[in-house]
Amino acid sequence: MIENWPKKPEGSQWTDDQWKAVVANGRDILVAAAAGSGKTAVLVERIIKKIINEENPVDVDRLLVVTFTNAAAQEMKNRIGEALEKVLIDEPGSQHVRKQLSLLNKASISTIHSFCLQVIRGYYYMLDVDPRFRIANQTENELLKEEVLDDILEEEYGIEDNTIFFELVDRYTSDRSDDDLQRMILALHTESRAHPNPEKWLDKLVEAYDVEGKTIEDLVYASYLLEDVKFQLETAEQHIRKATELAMLPDGPAPRIETLQADLALLGTLSSAARESWTSVYEAMQNVSWQTLKRIKKSDYNEDIVKQVDSLRNKAKDEVKKLQEELFSRRPESFLRDFQDMHPVLEKLVQLVKVFTERFQAMKRDKGMVDFTDLEHFCLQILSEQSEDGEMKPSAVALQYRNKFAEVLVDEYQDTNFVQESIIKFVTKDSESEGNLFMVGDVKQSIYRFRLAEPGLFLGKYKRFTQEGLGGGMKIDLAKNFRSRHEVLAGTNFIFKQIMGEEVGEIDYDADAELKLGASYPEGEDVAAELLCIQQTEEEVIDGEEGAEVEKAQLEARLMAQRIKAMVDSGYEVYDRKTDSMRPVQYRDFVILLRSMPWAPQIMEELKLQGIPVYADLATGYFEATEVNIMMNVFRVIDNPMQDIPLAAVLRSPIVGLNDEELATLRAHGKKGSFYEVMSSFLKGAPLEEEKELHDKLEWFYNLLQGWREFARQQSLSDLIWKVYGETGYYDFVGGLPAGKQRQANLRVLYDRARQYEATSFRGLFRFLRFIERILERGDDMGTARALGEQEDVVRIMTIHKSKGLEFPVVFVAGLGRRFNTQDLMKRFLLHKDFGFGSQFIDPRKRIKYTTLSQLAIKRKMKMELIAEEMRVLYVALTRAKEKLILIGTVKDATKEMEKWLDAREHSEWLLPDHVRAGASCYLDWIAPSLYRHRDSEMLLELGQGSIPDEIYGYDTSWKVEVVDGNTLLAPEPVQEEKQELLEALREKKAVPLQSERKDEVYDRLMWKYGYEEATSHRAKQSVTEIKRNYQSEEGSDNAFIKKLRAPIKTRPRFMEKKGLTYAERGTAVHAVMQHVDLKKPITVEVLQEQIAGMVNKELLTFEQAEEIAVEKVISFFDSDLGKRVLAAKSVEREVPFTMMLAAEEAYQDWQGESGESILVQGVIDCMIEEEDGITLIDFKTDTIEGKFPGGFEQAKPILETRYKVQLSLYAKALEKSLQHPVKEKCLYFFDGNHVIKVEE
């Protein structure tokens, strides 16, 4: 009980409310923890207090702690572990604490999904599920849904006399496809799974359309819309009252007052009818008649006031007209007929959803996979059973968990959904007044409705629970913020006291909800919050909405860049808690928050132009990367070569290398048919001389393509991808381009994606391509991952959602003028958890469609929920700031917008009028009207206080409100006078003016000469091959004989050559075999071929290289005397790399620099054998000799010896230096002809 709670220790760091949250017991407890209130610390302390309670200690594994993320769960475990270790220092003999530390790793501290998984693993036998199940990949899940749905619809299309189904198709599909119908089925399936009993929720949808024997007054849609009618009529009345006040001013249009009074009477009649019934309002709306305004002489009155009065009256009339057109242009019974007509169609739709759910679950079961919603529903299935009245009650397993858990603690409770709430309910005690559920969160930060989070669960308990906890649960408000300065908190409070209310916003921002100062900061300069509204003039706006958005982003980015640079350059100071002192601001202290990330690239670009380091996790652009795009087209062509666009892209790419002219030539060979058919036909004929090169390129690619297509049918996808990389050489090619490592990494990621795909239930190239398409359709492109340390000095750009839980000294909230995303309200059909299904009434026979009552109600409800969610998102954004908050938005016409924002300036209550808050289309529509009621806006408005209440006008907050001209931001920066002189001198090619005292220094620098000029014309590092060539050139050995020995040099990448291997590639292949051949095995044809195949599998050789190796020549070497010495040697080393210093004059015969200069020489020795009498080095050569010289090998021998003498001498010198043993013999072995040359000094 309350009186038995431990008292707060003297000098405790905890506030009274925090201490209450730590020790309160005996009932369900809801902690409303405002931003920065230390909720995690409170949660950890509560757990520790329970564990080490002297009277009734609880083992940590008897607590269930549910967190929102895995990272939060791990952090919680770490904090509890650290706290227990501190206790152990004070009580080293405590066996209980030691036991808790050992239990901590298996304690139930996890996300709700991890807990569900734990329950399912323990009780899988109660479900029809394979205990070896795996969690499905999201894209795999989508593909399975598509497959199941295609099968169902195909069956439905095949049923004769399937009248209702075809009526459903006629109403909700287009002439081209049934995509809309598929979307409806999938959306209904997804929404139903957010409820504990999906089938029951679906049945209620259908029941709502069964209006037999009902009147319009019985419909939930009509009841809700009547509330909206009252709301809009009240808005109209406010306009007329405001107009009347203006007309009564000394220079107001007094003759208008009589008409305005009649208007109020008319609106009063309508409002009275709205309080009675739908039918009453309908009848009243048919009799609406507005009086005609009396003519007045405008010069007798203040013209501006007359305009305002007439404008306000027109707004009121528009509100009524809108109601007449949307709701009351049809008789009530007409709306009922819509429901009755749509009932059988909706019934069929729900039946399809149920069939889909059943088959989808069966397919997942067959494949041994579950998704995250399955985890929740399977867990709920284990924890519940059906009672006699059809309701769900705890199962025997649930009762076991109730007995096990002393307390269940839920973090971020505001983000819980209905299914998760049911799971928690079944493992906790039934009675709230004697419960063991501890919930902590902040409903003002519930921003995950798109993930089906339900803030209403938190709000319901917050309204139901009391601070004393008498007769039910207890609520505790943690309102003290230990993060931010007074200016940030007061500024946030000032805005939200005016915009967030229960009617519009779902939450009363009352005294309990307000942020209260808990942090102490030293006095700071320029800490006032700011609103910077950028005026974008008509002339600046680029044609098109997209262009205008880009320009807005550029304007805001430039303003932020200027402010950041100015603050850093001026040494703006922020408080450092670690040193307990002020320090100059750094780039890492800034964050730019955006509602979404489309503007991020423009903002990054502007900041970089100003020299400001910046980072944003864009997570886009991977599939747009050139190298990935080209490879995806290759795979599309392998899957189906009849696709013209992918094939043309591959032919034009560096892989095949056709130019525009060659592509046109190919197309000209067959104007009909696909590119592939034309290419096949072209290759069958004999090419013209001028088309031979084109023919060779296409033949090379065509042969590869046929091989890939065959390989794709028999082998794994990942093997195919690596085969394509290898055989085209494209992986190596992109490595040589700018950002080559990144490009290769992108290709490796594609390979990894394929391996991940193959770990799913799908196989094959076609499915993989569809898999990637679904990723792109969902917008799940990937970006380059980058891990940032907390101390990395960059300005961060992130979404407001990503920033939740974080804090920054200086926060920019940008894009406040961007319109809210209302696309979900524009869909052909709407779904709502309470109101079910709503769509237009569509009559395909009469070819008409119109809005239904259900659609209007759901649309209005969703709009109000969207408004509430956007308020909470704004709250999260503003509460990230520790010391400085800067709000930025751009408007097309600031004057026009200001007139709108000033409409409610003199409103007498804290909360702005409902229609102002509900009618907002962007964040500025809330922020600006709020700030224009504060004294700090006077610098901009110069309007005086007027009738604004003192408590609002003089509220204790500091703001800077400014309108910034966009022209000044887009204008080029002025050039300094002295820089201008330099530019003019350069333009006119005159001598550049210099300050006299710097002339000598400039001259000396320009005339300076490097002391080691000779060394600059020679490399500081040389390979042995380069030194050999240098000597050959100096000695004039580049004669006809040597030319005969040299292979033609090809500089183009292999995939751009006609076909076959170069001489160099053949030589590399032979050297690779000589390096890896197993000398312990017999050297036979069969053994060598087996080893070469193994090298291909290990990617030491390509298939093409392996085919070119003459195995018999390798055997000939080992049959020779030299080869036998290798096999018999004490030790054999192959491909021995070395590096050594060599005198420059030894490397360069033309050296004329300082003596004693050295260069670095590196090389690789093919083979070194150690025999009883010393070391022999062997260099393998693949030069073509036979048939090149009239005198045969004897004629070539001296030339070859001269050519390679320097090379072998350097090899020998390197070996002797490193091994400290002389080299007794240096041998050249030529595979062509099986010749050996012993090179003498």
Swiss-Prot record:
<comment type="similarity">
    <text>Belongs to the helicase family. AddA subfamily.</text>
</comment>
<dbReference type="InterPro" id="IPR038726">
    <property type="entry name" value="PDDEXK_AddAB-type"/>
</dbReference>
<keyword id="KW-0269">Exonuclease</keyword>
<keyword id="KW-0413">Isomerase</keyword>
<dbReference type="GO" id="GO:0033202">
    <property type="term" value="C:DNA helicase complex"/>
</dbReference>
<dbReference type="InterPro" id="IPR014017">
    <property type="entry name" value="DNA_helicase_UvrD-like_C"/>
</dbReference>
<keyword id="KW-0347">Helicase</keyword>
<dbReference type="Pfam" id="PF12705">
    <property type="entry name" value="PDDEXK_1"/>
</dbReference>
<feature type="domain" description="UvrD-like helicase C-terminal">
    <location>
        <begin position="505"/>
        <end position="805"/>
    </location>
</feature>
<dbReference type="GO" id="GO:0000724">
    <property type="term" value="P:double-strand break repair via homologous recombination"/>
</dbReference>
<keyword id="KW-0238">DNA-binding</keyword>
<dbReference type="GO" id="GO:0043138">
    <property type="term" value="F:3'-5' DNA helicase activity"/>
</dbReference>
<comment type="function">
    <text>The heterodimer acts as both an ATP-dependent DNA helicase and an ATP-dependent, dual-direction single-stranded exonuclease. Recognizes the chi site generating a DNA molecule suitable for the initiation of homologous recombination. The AddA nuclease domain is required for chi fragment generation; this subunit has the helicase and 3' -&gt; 5' nuclease activities.</text>
</comment>
<keyword id="KW-0378">Hydrolase</keyword>
<keyword id="KW-0227">DNA damage</keyword>
<dbReference type="Pfam" id="PF00580">
    <property type="entry name" value="UvrD-helicase"/>
</dbReference>
<keyword id="KW-0540">Nuclease</keyword>
<feature type="binding site">
    <location>
        <begin position="33"/>
        <end position="40"/>
    </location>
    <ligand>
        <name>ATP</name>
    </ligand>
</feature>
<dbReference type="InterPro" id="IPR011604">
    <property type="entry name" value="PDDEXK-like_dom_sf"/>
</dbReference>
<keyword id="KW-0234">DNA repair</keyword>
<protein>
    <recommendedName>
        <fullName>ATP-dependent helicase/nuclease subunit A</fullName>
        <ecNumber>3.1.-.-</ecNumber>
        <ecNumber>5.6.2.4</ecNumber>
    </recommendedName>
</protein>
<feature type="domain" description="UvrD-like helicase ATP-binding">
    <location>
        <begin position="12"/>
        <end position="485"/>
    </location>
</feature>
<dbReference type="InterPro" id="IPR011335">
    <property type="entry name" value="Restrct_endonuc-II-like"/>
</dbReference>
<keyword id="KW-0067">ATP-binding</keyword>
<dbReference type="InterPro" id="IPR014152">
    <property type="entry name" value="AddA"/>
</dbReference>
<dbReference type="Pfam" id="PF13361">
    <property type="entry name" value="UvrD_C"/>
</dbReference>
<dbReference type="GO" id="GO:0008408">
    <property type="term" value="F:3'-5' exonuclease activity"/>
</dbReference>
<dbReference type="InterPro" id="IPR000212">
    <property type="entry name" value="DNA_helicase_UvrD/REP"/>
</dbReference>
<dbReference type="InterPro" id="IPR014016">
    <property type="entry name" value="UvrD-like_ATP-bd"/>
</dbReference>
<dbReference type="GO" id="GO:0003690">
    <property type="term" value="F:double-stranded DNA binding"/>
</dbReference>
<comment type="subunit">
    <text>Heterodimer of AddA and AddB/RexB.</text>
</comment>
<keyword id="KW-0547">Nucleotide-binding</keyword>
<dbReference type="GO" id="GO:0005829">
    <property type="term" value="C:cytosol"/>
</dbReference>
<dbReference type="GO" id="GO:0016887">
    <property type="term" value="F:ATP hydrolysis activity"/>
</dbReference>
<dbReference type="InterPro" id="IPR027417">
    <property type="entry name" value="P-loop_NTPase"/>
</dbReference>
<dbReference type="GO" id="GO:0005524">
    <property type="term" value="F:ATP binding"/>
</dbReference>
